[in-house]
């Protein structure tokens, strides 16, 4: 794992989760923010999210509990939460899907989109569609 992504757990207190531990970890939490960076060798923005994610957690002053996907779990989470692009932030309430933000955004976009996601009712995530992966930057 790249040192900047590892620092999410080691320095910033993000709890690492796998496909086997996410449900148990997220269920008791009010709102969890699952950070899924992607492979820095293949995803140019992955390290940007590793820098921005701790700042988002600080900005929301305890409203979200930070989690980080292990590299081995990222593709599983992609299928489970239906996103096509990395990096991504997935928001869960008591382990249930609220929404996701793909790619890197302007700070003002995060500050507008995250509160809107946090107000949503839990729902099923979108189904993963491979064809959505080309050029789609919309939030789910």
Regions found by a protein language model. Give the residues of each.
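Conserved strand-to-helix beginnings and helix N-cap segments that scaffold or border functional pockets
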Residues: 46-50, 111
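Structural micro-motif
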Residues: 30-32, 81-93
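N-terminal leader/targeting and pre-domain segments
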Residues: 1-31, 120-140
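Alpha-helix N-cap/helix-start motif
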Residues: 45-46, 100
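Short histidine/acidic/glycine/proline-rich micro-motifs that form metal-
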Residues: 39-43
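Charged, surface-exposed interaction regions in soluble eukaryotic proteins
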Residues: 64-80, 84-87, 102-105
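Non-catalytic, surface beta->alpha helical segment in thiol-disulfide oxidoreductase systems
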Residues: 90-131
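Thiol-based oxidoreductase modules, predominantly thioredoxin-like and allied folds used
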Residues: 16, 36-38, 49, 54-75
């Amino acid at each position: 794992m790249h040192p900047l992504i590892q620092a999410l757990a080691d320095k910033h207190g993000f709890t690492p989760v796998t496909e086997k531990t996410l449900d148990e970890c997220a269920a008791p939490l009010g709102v969890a923010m699952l950070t899924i960076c992607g492979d820095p060798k293949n995803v140019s923005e992955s390290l940007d999210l590793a820098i921005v994610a701790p700042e988002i957690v600080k900005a929301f002053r305890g409203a979200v509990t930070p989690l980080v996907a292990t590299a081995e779990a990222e593709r599983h989470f992609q299928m489970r939460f239906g996103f096509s692009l990395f990096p991504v932030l997935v928001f869960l309430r008591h382990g249930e899907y609220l929404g996701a933000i793909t790619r890197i955004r302007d700070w003002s976009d995060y500050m507008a989109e995250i509160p809107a996601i946090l107000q949503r009712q839990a729902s099923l995530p979108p189904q993963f569609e491979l064809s959505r992966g080309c050029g789609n930057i919309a939030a789910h």
